[in-house]
Amino acid sequence: MEPPAARVTPSIKADCSHSVNIICEETVLHSLVSHLSAALRREGISVFVDACGLQETKFFSIKQNQPLTDGARVLVVVISDEVEFYDPWFPKFLKVIQGWQNNGHVVVPVFYGVDSLTRVYGWANSWLEAEKLTSHQSKILSNNVLTDSELVEEIVRDVYGKLYPAERVGIYARLLEIEKLLYKQHRDIRSIGIWGMPGIGKTTLAKAVFNHMSTDYDASCFIENFDEAFHKEGLHRLLKERIGKILKDEFDIESSYIMRPTLHRDKLYDKRILVVLDDVRDSLAAESFLKRLDWFGSGSLIIITSVDKQVFAFCQINQIYTVQGLNVHEALQLFSQSVFGINEPEQNDRKLSMKVIDYVNGNPLALSIYGRELMGKKSEMETAFFELKHCPPLKIQDVLKNAYSALSDNEKNIVLDIAFFFKGETVNYVMQLLEESHYFPRLAIDVLVDKCVLTISENTVQMNNLIQDTCQEIFNGEIETCTRMWEPSRIRYLLEYDELEGSGETKAMPKSGLVAEHIESIFLDTSNVKFDVKHDAFKNMFNLKFLKIYNSCSKYISGLNFPKGLDSLPYELRLLHWENYPLQSLPQDFDFGHLVKLSMPYSQLHKLGTRVKDLVMLKRLILSHSLQLVECDILIYAQNIELIDLQGCTGLQRFPDTSQLQNLRVVNLSGCTEIKCFSGVPPNIEELHLQGTRIREIPIFNATHPPKVKLDRKKLWNLLENFSDVEHIDLECVTNLATVTSNNHVMGKLVCLNMKYCSNLRGLPDMVSLESLKVLYLSGCSELEKIMGFPRNLKKLYVGGTAIRELPQLPNSLEFLNAHGCKHLKSINLDFEQLPRHFIFSNCYRFSSQVIAEFVEKGLVASLARAKQEELIKAPEVIICIPMDTRQRSSFRLQAGRNAMTDLVPWMQKPISGFSMSVVVSFQDDYHNDVGLRIRCVGTWKTWNNQPDRIVERFFQCWAPTEAPKVVADHIFVLYDTKMHPSDSEENHISMWAHEVKFEFHTVSGENNPLGASCKVTECGVEVITAATGDTSVSGIIRESETITIIEKEDTIIDEEDTPLLSRKPEETNRSRSSSELQKLSSTSSKVRSKGNVFWKWLGCFPLQPKNLRSRSRRTTALEEALEEALKEREKLEDTRELQIALIESKKIKKIKQADERDQIKHADEREQRKHSKDHEEEEIESNEKEERRHSKDYVIEELVLKGKGKRKQLDDDKADEKEQIKHSKDHVEEEVNPPLSKCKDCKSAIEDGISINAYGSVWHPQCFCCLRCREPIAMNEISDLRGMYHKPCYKELRHPNCYVCEKKIPRTAEGLKYHEHPFWMETYCPSHDGDGTPKCCSCERLEHCGTQYVMLADFRWLCRECMDSAIMDSDECQPLHFEIREFFEGLHMKIEEEFPVYLVEKNALNKAEKEEKIDKQGDQCLMVVRGICLSEEQIVTSVSQGVRRMLNKQILDTVTESQRVVRKCEVTAILILYGLPRLLTGYILAHEMMHAYLRLNGYRNLNMVLEEGLCQVLGYMWLECQTYVFDTATIASSSSSSRTPLSTTTSKKVDPSDFEKRLVNFCKHQIETDESPFFGDGFRKVNKMMASNNHSLKDTLKEIISISKTPQYSKL
């Protein structure tokens, strides 16, 4: 039994082998480390955190040969910016870490927030390399920018991989991906299929998902090898033994009812079940099995693993997760662990390891098996791997043979052909060949892809190396029916001419006989063989369909000779590919009728033959570089041909008319130097290559698809007269093309013209009329000096490497211009009307600084204009690359490094349209543009109100690979983009407004990989651009930035006499300003007012950020304006005198400087006159006048300075004194404007944000100036000297409170003001409400407020709405809590082995059970309300089986009860808990009663009642303390028992408590601590005192109580 209290998530027993220790500084405990700890615990990893710092951590005292705390395997060391790396203690700490590593522990270093590279890299690199450690770095140190969440995920993945064995490598990342897929599904019965090739890890992943998620479901079942189990046991038996066992064990339903689950649907409709069917191949079996599971409740999950994607379609699986092979890092780790026993191989073994990884394509099973096969063979590893490739290990063969045996005969034939011959060929080509072989490949290939036998990549057919080698091995096992040949030795046996055979003798037969009639395919590589072929070699090969003879090493060498010629070729040939065919003709009787592809490059053919009836099957003809070929007239019979390649056939004199070939797409006649005429163009031609021909004329034609034409030679432009529909013309590398005449009227549809590297091209016609031209390539035309004009719709222009000096007016449509290496280019003319824009002027050194400035300014102006157009779909963008000019450095306001910080003020947020970013990139001599260049920009928006920072990332494409081949010296990239600005939806929320933005710039490749030291960012600068900006030049933007800063500073200086500025409404603020101030502010409206008058809207109610003038380079005029405004507002203040003196000094000094500047100008003119007149006398006069003027000026300056300070001193002629005094005057002015920072009286920290409250003789932060009653901040307009630091309502409540219940003033009596106040909730109410029937919550003991909703339970107890939200209403709902508390006991090393039920009952049933239990009521126990009881006797209990959760106003909630007979199997028969209490309170009562059960089960029945109840109260209090920890409240109660809670060795479930639940925990603890009863209150305090005095755990204290139970002191206790 126990008194009132509450609950929390239980701890889980720590597994020392899977635990982690974290050492960190206290500053990162509540940021990175808290998130890291939570993430590790979610993965079932126990975590202990030591936040004492690296220097004072308790681990520092552990000896090097001792294990870590709790036997943890992994130590995470978080190194933050507070660590002093050069202190003497740090090397000692590293030695300790080395000792832990030597002892078998794993150290994971994490560098977090370290902002100085020089502080870390020196020693860190040497340490990491020496210890072979892999570190994790935050975004400050890493080139790859990581957010905190990404860093945590990376660390957890690393730790997870180090804790678990090798077979779980790579599992964690795949678990996360599956979880993301499941979260996207609806809350109905969810399903997911895990698909992949054999050995890829489907079963391992499914088991990991099952183990990870099974605890979240009411029941779970994993059926391994489903097909085998189904066919062995049958449907009914499988359901009964696997699913029926769930019904029996979890829901107490007989397994015989599995075929009739509808009989118990009322019990099962809300049960969440997890079922995994592994390795499903028979889709019908799986479908019939799943049909019986339609009774699963919402939220259930079905997982199926299979190599066949069609299974998922049959079983109606919602989503499919494709298991990919391990990445390089994971595969290297797994293979290294398997073969070497370490996580990463040594450098000498890395090359072979990468070969194995590439071969198996990251297959985990193959990596493990190959690793074991190669273990211990280090010296012969290369040879062993070569043998394994040709004969895969039996285990791999067995796995893959199962997949092969499940295929149909047709599918097997296709697989074998692809494995031997067609891997890597295009899909259409393979289908054409196989269709003619009657294999029906169109459907079969899709089926094979679904079964993971084939893959389609970039329109080519691919096959895994393991499957390919296994298929070849399978085929070798069926040698008696050999149909495919690829081994040179066996092919040589069939084809070779032998003199023995000619003389009548027989050759020696190979071990396995070969039958020519059975052969269907021959693929011979002649690179390693050379022999003579007999003339009738192919005579009996009637079924030969594919013949390919090639040399993989050289295309020009043939290893075959035909001493007697070749008589015949098989009639059934579909593919004839013969490189370097040595004969002049094909056999005379050879029929081309079945050929699909004829490929004979580098052959000696003269012609193709004469016996040609029909070439309807021929699709491809390739006779390239056949130098002896003179005619190919047979092409006119190939009506379905698609490709003709006769490249390099220099002897070919004519090409037949192909105008009737409807399917012909590609014709390549390049290099056919003797062809003069092209008589007919195919109607559907797509590519026509005519380079190197003598063609002078092309006939008129109308192409259905405009072709891509490649031409060359002088004035070939005229050949295109009849190409009215041509879209692409390629004249690349035509070195003898000098001029191009104008035929624009016939090129109306030309889209792309490529004339790159036409090195002799000197002139181009005016191309203005080519309205369809979009892309023009002129790069590398080194002699081209002038271009007449460009088409108006041109989008991309490449003129790099030309001799152009001036570009004409560029079209407005132009989006991309590459002028790399235009060394003579001086000017450019372009309007920025179309965005985005991208211009490359790298290595263009003739541009003047004025041209650069004007060009950049035009881009920014256009960008601003386009940014205002909301209908613009694509965000405006400008990217300009130009060489860095030192004269322009000041214009871009650059600073060293790759980081730039930009300060913002609140009213600037809405009108910001983007940023102008200037990035200087230094290119070294070894830089070559092989991978492209991008600039990665990461903008971190520092937000108000402690909101998380917003990170906006953007990649700016500078140039693609080879676009700027070689870049030298420094170049500046000017970038503008609106995407760096957050979305409007975020801006409009006040909590998301930022006060500053930090930009980081990195150089990356086109694939976003970091580039090396040859290309790096050295300087950068960022300027804010607003939509209301008037002057958009670079200098104008800088001036506007300064003006904004001045205005902002003025607003922070202004001080009102009565009401603080920040507490006023905008209207009041405006009225309070002086007319001169309003006039000044209104005059700057064009620059600082935003849309909707944002400035005036927020100036009076949003805190402005102070700016330190010392940290900014201000002009003297800026200081004067600030001082003038300050003086206008402070005329009535006493310190105005000093400010006036400083202002007068500043103004007079300015006048002197201006006079000096005028004198200098005058003197310059006079010196020029003297130079021409050579009048020495005037020079002497001028010298004297200058000296007198200098002395006069010195006297005036000194006089003014001395007068400003109120002192008189002797004049000092030293110029250093003059500068020092002027500097002192400026500093004096700045100190007046920027007084020293004050400190808050409450938190003692400096007040840096410019907002403070000056009250009661002290200065406070606004959030620290709080009411003494409610501890909430007090607004400035609520401050009153009369009531002190109280809110007005709080002060009234303190002096004359209202009744919480009736909301009326508590009446005064003759004895004064009397009221009752709850000791914890601090709610005051009239004394009369204690007896007038006002509802009182049975849980939190609060009286109910009038008019509020409340609930009366069936046993007439009241429950408030807050407690009702988390109330546990029936016995089933209490079971998860029961299991959690059992785990909590286990974490205390007090595991309860025996099982007993826990029932929730009504109050009457609890009282009845108490009487039958015959509990001896003593003392105050009679007065206690019984809310829980631990039974030891058999009896019938009426439990609540169903409670109603509706919120009804003043109505009784009914329940459904059922009788349960508790049977005595041990010392405890059952535990009864009062139903309808909140989960927290129910958990506390259950923990209390389970402590009673523990005592009885362990034979402690005769303990003193006070000590027994005290032990139970302490246990309940510890459980509540655990809840306090999980809820992450501000502080943990200092009770001695709390320090012994098993927080460090347990893992609690994730909860999201409300504020009321957090307060309810503290209420329950308060009730325990303040209980005055002899049993519960005194017992708690006595046991707690014993634990504190001896520093014992609860279990040790129990042993101590037992040990003294026989002494005389025991009775006194």
From Swiss-Prot:
LRR repeats: 448-473, 516-540, 569-592, 594-615, 617-637, 638-661, 662-682, 683-703, 723-747, 748-770, 771-791, 792-816, 822-847, 888-911
Basic and acidic residues biased stretches: 1153-1169, 1209-1231
Region (Disordered): 1057-1085, 1152-1191, 1207-1231
Residue ranges annotated for the TIR domain, each copy included: 15-163
Keyword Disulfide bond attributed: no
Keywords attached to this entry: ATP-binding, Coiled coil, Leucine-rich repeat, LIM domain, Metal-binding, Nucleotide-binding, Repeat, Zinc
GO molecular function, one term: ADP binding
Phenotypic effect of disruption: No visible phenotype under normal growth conditions.
A Pfam family hit: NB-ARC
NB-ARC domain sequence ranges: 178-427
Keyword hit for Zinc: yes
Ranges for domain LIM zinc-binding: 1238-1297
Biological process according to GO: defense response; response to cold; signal transduction
PROSITE patterns: LIM_DOMAIN_1 (PS00478), LIM_DOMAIN_2 (PS50023), TIR (PS50104), ZINC_PROTEASE (PS00142)
Ranges in a coiled coil: 1109-1234
Low complexity composition bias: residue spans: 1072-1085
Signal peptide start-end: none
Protein function: NB-LRR receptor-like protein that modulates growth, cell death and freezing tolerance in a temperature-dependent manner. May be involved in defense responses.
Miscellaneous comment text of the record: The gain-of-function mutants chs3-1 show no visible phenotype when grown at the permissive temperature of 22 degrees Celsius. Mutant plants (chs3-1) germinated and grown at 16 degrees Celsius show developmental defects, including dwarfism, with small and curly leaves, early senescence of cotyledons, constitutively activated defense responses and enhanced tolerance to freezing temperatures.
Name the record gives this protein: Protein DA1-related 4
Organism: Arabidopsis thaliana
Gene of this entry: DAR4
